[in-house]
Swiss-Prot record:
Family of the protein in this entry: Belongs to the class-II aminoacyl-tRNA synthetase family.
Protein name per UniProt: Alanine--tRNA ligase
Classification via SUPFAM superfamilies: Class II aaRS and biotin synthetases, Putative anticodon-binding domain of alanyl-tRNA synthetase (AlaRS), ThrRS/AlaRS common domain, Translation proteins
Enzyme class, broadest EC rank: ligase
Subcellular location(s) per record: Cytoplasm
Keywords, in A-Z order: Aminoacyl-tRNA synthetase, ATP-binding, Cytoplasm, Ligase, Nucleotide-binding, Protein biosynthesis, RNA-binding, tRNA-binding
Cell membrane recorded as keyword: no
Catalytic activity: tRNA(Ala) + L-alanine + ATP = L-alanyl-tRNA(Ala) + AMP + diphosphate
Record-level GO BP terms: alanyl-tRNA aminoacylation
Any Pfam family: tRNA_SAD
SMART domains found in the cross-reference section: tRNA_SAD (SM00863)
Enzyme Commission designation: 6.1.1.7
Species per Swiss-Prot/TrEMBL record: Lacticaseibacillus paracasei (strain ATCC 334 / BCRC 17002 / CCUG 31169 / CIP 107868 / KCTC 3260 / NRRL B-441)
Record-annotated disulphide pairs: none
Length: 881
């Protein structure tokens, strides 16, 4: 068997299948861009679904790839076993209705055993087959695998319910008894058994059957091949390491961690080794995930990242690392993987910044959290208890940022567990408190019992009309009670059909009127939300009698709808422009579309520069002026994916979705309203950009008339400034301001010089005649200086001159009092502290203060009290002495 690096092994696999006519598919992003059902890409085939389900026809039906993947269902086992990882690479070769068993089996054997390729010893290879799959067994025999190296196993059948299925065949490598964790005569000591001697290196799935809803299996007309070979395991076998962690994929990370630890070394302590392995795995995972655009947060994949980073930081603490360190491993990961993933080093600074920020955030509460957790565990052990109360686990989560899974893992290491039911109860109580704090307004997720009971359908007609003259009133709800009629007050109404848009996806609801057939206004619509069963629920202020079963004229405010629609389109253009300028790591994190402005939240670490904002703004305006047609249609979700429509993570989509397309520039899954052409927006102007949380930025902007008014207001302010500066043309304002700033700086320098002279003059006499009070020399005087800074300068001169034992100074600045007290070592030894003395005299000027034992200061609102404060200082000193 050849000795190769991990990079060479990966490349050899791809080169082999390229020689067999396969197209090399680049590794896709870890973040699924066309599959809302997945949190992460978790296998080599996950990115190829579009080919196997027939929604996209590949240019070449033979495909090979090395796909980065993340699986997080066994996080707690990472580091504690020889095989669990959260990030891994899956090597694979695939056939979409092209070749099948008689081709793939000989190829697999050739790649593994040929001296030209991996060069495995055939005697150390074993294969497993499904007992009923006689064809596969015969093909392995023809390939040269002896019968005693072919194992029949009932679990060699791939089936996930309805859909494609079929037998599979696994290939194992015999590492020898020296690598085993069970005895040679153990019943599990066979290829496919629970042992560490026989390592599975490849799985070949023969997708030849279709599992029907009635449970029957029928043969598929087009047979497919799906294979998976874990790179990390393969590298461990080829490099002859005890586990995957000793390979060149992990050891550089472990060595770098050793250098930052408190003298810890890998391979010395089993307990320390667990921490080294956890850090190495998690460093890889978070580096690649953030590189692909994921960011730490409290939900979804962001929560997974936060949990991994904090788990790594906690294990770093176990190794004696008390500073931010995980971000320093990013370039190590990048260097290891640069041959196939150069983008890690290219994006290194951004990835490091995200991790460092998250580390620093957690480290603020880490020590206190660990101390509390250790105390909880010690108390439980002393009382003979085995379960951490849910309330304590919640406190660790809510106050100290400890994911409950991490607390539970920490507890398990101590032979304890967390009361998860109690934790969930506390979480539910917190959510309930949050709901109450938000008030009683019923939201889209309202589960009110009365509304839940309403199942009458309601159709939205507002895509094509703003007036619907014959809407039948189906339901009236007043104070959570169903009624047949209403004549005043506030009510909630459901019609069989309505043009009113219900708030959704950040777009606010339509407003308007409900009228009688003669045009008499009977109610004003102030809000529309989705009822629990999907109907549009209109909140109205009633002006006339409304009755169920009657028909009414529903009229949407056309101007409000138009303005909201324009701003909604602007969010789509803004979203795309941000991706164009900042990169694909940027994605929408929230939005609000109002009639008069729009707000758009997006992921990005660091402030967006003025230059970048100008680029974004320019792109959006250019797309507006390009007069791009805006079209929308409903279509099957798979067809929408083929169009490359952007799906918002966290949103759930049915089998039929609505797609909004702005020319060829932007295509998104969307349920909002839009104009028919981008030129309807007229103008787009960003009014602010700010940070609202870790990794989340917010842009506010205006369009159309509001954008014009905003620019007009800016122009008015600029003109007013020019007038005040006595400038004829506003274009000269910047140069005039620059000149004034230079003049001001020069004047400030002059003033500072004069103040220094005044301070020197003031100091000239105040130190000359100290008085003796209580056996100590005291200088207590009111001086005329510019402020507290000058008082401190006087105190420095007093200290240098050793003019007295205690100094008390007061000055009036802008109608307020400043006091300063300084004491030397002699006064300190006599029991006088500056902080105590300042607290005693500050009330005389109507203020308070504090400071160090040798110097303290105070401020107050009553400068007239300065003489009394100085006198009080003498009294306090004389009494204490």
């Amino acid at each position: 068997m050849k000795k190769m690096s991990s990079g060479e092994i990966r490349q050899m696999f791809l080169d082999f299948f390229k020689s067999k006519g396969h197209a090399v598919e680049p590794s896709a992003s870890l973040i699924p861009v066309d599959d809302p059902t997945l949190l992460w890409i978790n296998s080599g085939v996950a990115t190829l679904k579009k080919y196997f389900d027939g929604s996209v026809v590949p240019d070449n039906p033979r495909i090979t790839n090395a796909q980065k993947s993340i699986r997080t269902n066994d996080i707690e086992n990472v580091g504690k076993t020889a095989r669990h990882l959260t990030f891994f690479e899956m090597l694979g070769n695939f056939s979409v209705g092209d070749y099948f068993k008689k081709e793939v089996i000989p190829w697999a054997w050739e790649l593994l055993t040929s001296p030209k390729w991996f060069g495995f010893d055939p005697k150390r290879l074993y294969v497993t087959v499904y007992p009923k799959d006689k064809v596969t067994k015969e093909l392995w025999q023809k390939t040269g695998v002896p019968d005693d190296h072919i194992v029949e196993a009932e679990d060699n059948f791939w089936d996930i319910g309805e859909g494609p299925s079929g037998p599979d065949s696994e290939i194992f490598y015999d590492r020898g008894q020296q690598f085993n964790n069970v005895a040679e005569d153990d019943p599990e000591n066979y290829p496919g058994g629970e042992n560490s001697r026989y390592v599975e290196i490849w799985n070949i799935v023969f997708s030849e059957l279709n599992h029907l809803p009635d449970g029957r299996f029928v043969e598929q007309p087009h047979k497919n091949i799906d294979t998976g070979m874990g790179l990390e395991r393969l590298v461990a076998v080829i490099q002859g390491t005890p586990t995957i962690f000793e390979t060149d994929l992990f050891m550089p990370i472990i060595k770098a961690t050793e250098k930052m630890s408190a003298g810890k070394r890998y391979g010395v302590s089993a307990q320390d080794d667990v921490s080294f392995k956890i850090i190495a795995d998690h460093a890889r995972t978070v580096t690649f995930a953030i590189g692909d655009g994921a960011l730490p947060s409290n939900e979804g994949r962001g929560y997974v990242l936060r949990r991994l980073i904090r788990r790594a930081v906690l294990n770093g603490k176990k190794l004696g690392i008390d500073h931010d360190f995980l971000y320093q491993l990013v370039p190590v990961v990048g260097e290891i993987m640069k041959s196939y993933y150069p983008q890690i080093l290219a994006n290194q600074q951004f990835i490091q910044k995200v991790i460092e920020s998250e580390e620093a955030r957690f480290r603020q509460t880490l020590d206190a959290g660990v101390t509390l957790l250790n105390q909880i565990i010690a108390d439980l052990k002393q009382d003979g208890k085995k379960e951490i109360p849910g309330a304590d686990a919640f406190k660790l989560f809510d106050t100290y940022g400890f994911p409950v899974e991490m607390t539970n893992e920490y507890a398990q290491d101590e032979g304890l567990q967390v009361d998860m039911a109690g934790f969930k109860k506390n979480m539910a109580a917190q959510r309930d408190r949050a709901r109450k704090a938000r008030g009683d307004r019923q939201s889209m997720g309202s589960q009110d019992k009365v509304l839940m009971s309403i199942t009458t359908p309601s159709k939205f007609t507002g895509w094509t009309e703003l007036d619907h003259k014959h809407a039948s009133l189906q339901t009236i709800v007043v104070n959570d009670q169903l009624q047949d009629s209403v004549s005043e007050g506030t009510a909630q109404l459901i019609f069989d059909e309505t043009p009113f848009y219900a708030e959704m996806g950040g777009q606010v609801a339509d407003h308007g009127e409900i009228k009688a057939q003669d045009g008499t206004v009977l109610a004003d619509v102030s809000d529309v939300q989705h009822a629990p069963n999907g109907q549009n629920l209109h909140t109205v202020t009633v002006k006339g009698k409304l009755e169920t079963g009657q028909q009414y004229w529903l009229s949407v405010d056309p101007l409000r709808r138009k303005k909201v629609s324009l701003n909604h389109t602007a969010t789509h253009l803004l979203d795309q422009a941000l991706r164009d300028v900042l990169g694909e790591h940027t994605h929408q994190a929230g939005s609000l579309v109002e009639p008069d402005y729009l707000r758009f939240d997006f992921t990005n670490f660091g402030q967006v520069t003025p230059k970048q904002l100008r680029q974004v703004e320019t792109i959006v305006n250019q797309k507006i002026w390009d007069a791009l047609p805006i079209t929308w249609k409903e279509m099957p979700i798979e067809e929408a994916k083929k169009l490359g429509a952007i799906a918002m993570f966290g949103d759930k989509y049915g089998s039929v979705v609505r797609i909004v397309k702005i020319g060829d520039y932007n295509t998104e899954f969307d349920g909002g309203t839009h104009p028919t052409n981008s030129n309807a927006l007229g103008l787009f102007k960003i009014t602010s950009e700010s940070g609202i949380g870790a990794g989340i930025r917010r842009v506010e902007a205006v369009t159309s008339k509001e954008a014009y008014e905003y620019l007009t207001q800016q122009q008015d302010w600029l003109s007013e400034t020019a007038e005040n500066l006595k400038i004829d043309q506003v274009k000269n304002v910047p140069s005039k301001v620059t000149q004034l700033q230079a003049d001001l700086k020069a004047e400030q320098k002059t003033v500072a010089g004069l103040q220094a002279k005044l301070a020197a003059q003031a100091a000239a006499g105040i130190f000359d005649h100290p008085e003796e009070v209580g056996g100590l020399k005291l200088i207590a005087k009111q001086v005329q200086v510019a402020g507290m800074n000058e008082l401190r300068q006087l105190a420095d001169k007093w200290k240098a001159k050793q003019a007295s034992d205690i100094l008390v100074l007061g000055t009036e600045v802008s109608g307020k009092a400043n006091l300063l007290v300084a004491v030397n070592d002699t006064a300190n030894q006599a029991g006088f502290k500056a902080g105590d003395l300042i607290k005693a005299i500050a009330p005389k000027v109507g203020g308070g203060g504090g400071g160090r034992p040798d110097m303290a200061q105070a401020g107050g609102k009553n400068p007239a009290g300065i003489p009394a404060a100085l006198s009080e200082a003498k009294t306090v000193i004389s009494q204490k002495a």
